[in-house]
């Protein structure tokens, strides 16, 4: 009876007098309980995946070697793609870098890189890293090279290891020029990792040193012959430094906010402990 009355098409007296409209009920999907359970499980798996895509763990198959002292690593292709997709799903600003290089610039960079690699992979990273340490000798302490004379740097195994990271990073960039979101996510994470290096002397002003040395290295290996190619390198390096700086500033801001909250919590506890209304205080 109750169900039949609820489905009655006739209007009640209150509806006629006050012209009250009946609320429209939504139809419930007729899917089985098994289908609903499967969809719930898939949603939980996707949520767990979204929570873990921001990690930057290195496996044995990664292109860049892990340097634990600096916490610098390159995410593999699948991981970088997952992080990019998660950022796009979250509605972040990751899609704004879609066209930071033109198609022509990407072609020029790929051609330049192929030509430059003929001189030897180690030579490229070694040139950039040596220029950085020469321009800013204080940076040597960050990498544990402060006691190595400038003339002996290129023979030090630690220098060679870090120089190889520069080379492999550039190779990773060139291979992923068609995936700007992947590059942005990687270099933002790399910038965040530099926050921990402040305790060893890293300063935000070093970003400019990195940019200038990388640009100067490109000028030297191009020998000023191809102005459009040099312009493409400048644009690429500018974007890389911009992504790293943004990640660094974001992580540094979170760290400062956390320290402020912890200090505020500690001071509040201290004030409560000396309150005149506390038990045992006369």
UniProtKB/Swiss-Prot annotation:
Basic and acidic residues: bias regions: 13-23
Induction: Induced by paraquat, a chemical causing production of reactive oxygen species (ROS).
Domain of life: Eukaryota
Disulfide bond entries: none
Region annotated Disordered, chain positions: 1-46
Domain Globin: 100-249
Biased composition (Polar residues): 28-41
Entry function: Involved in oxidative stress resistance.
Protein name, entry field: Globin-related protein glb-13
Annotated source species: Caenorhabditis elegans
The encoding gene: glb-13
């Amino acid at each position: 009876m109750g169900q039949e009355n609820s489905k009655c098409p006739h209007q009640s007296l209150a509806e006629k007098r006050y012209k009250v409209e009946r609320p429209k009920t939504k139809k419930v999907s007729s899917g089985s309980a098994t289908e609903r359970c499967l969809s719930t499980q898939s949603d939980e798996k996707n949520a767990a995946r979204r929570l873990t895509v921001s990690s930057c763990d290195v496996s044995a198959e990664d292109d860049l070697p892990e340097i634990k002292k600096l916490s610098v690593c390159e995410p593999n292709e699948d991981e970088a793609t997952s992080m990019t997709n998660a950022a796009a799903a979250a509605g972040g600003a990751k899609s704004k870098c879609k066209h930071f290089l033109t198609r022509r610039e990407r072609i020029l960079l790929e051609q330049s890189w192929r030509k430059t690699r003929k001189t030897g992979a180690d030579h490229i990273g070694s040139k950039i890293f040596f220029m950085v340490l020469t321009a800013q000798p204080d940076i040597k302490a960050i990498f544990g090279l402060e006691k190595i004379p400038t003339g002996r740097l290129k023979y030090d195994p630690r220098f060679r290891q870090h120089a190889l990271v520069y080379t492999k990073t550039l190779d990773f960039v060139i291979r992923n020029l068609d995936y700007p979101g992947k590059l942005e996510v990687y270099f933002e994470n790399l910038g965040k990792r530099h926050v921990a290096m402040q305790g060893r002397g890293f300063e935000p002003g070093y970003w400019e040193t990195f940019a200038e040395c990388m640009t100067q290295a490109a000028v030297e290996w191009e020998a000023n012959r191809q102005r459009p190619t040099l312009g493409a390198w400048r644009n690429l390096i500018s974007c890389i430094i911009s992504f790293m700086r943004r990640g660094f500033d974001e992580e540094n801001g979170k760290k400062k906010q956390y320290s402020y909250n912890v200090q505020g919590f500690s001071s509040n506890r201290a004030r409560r402990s000396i309150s005149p209304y506390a038990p045992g205080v006369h």
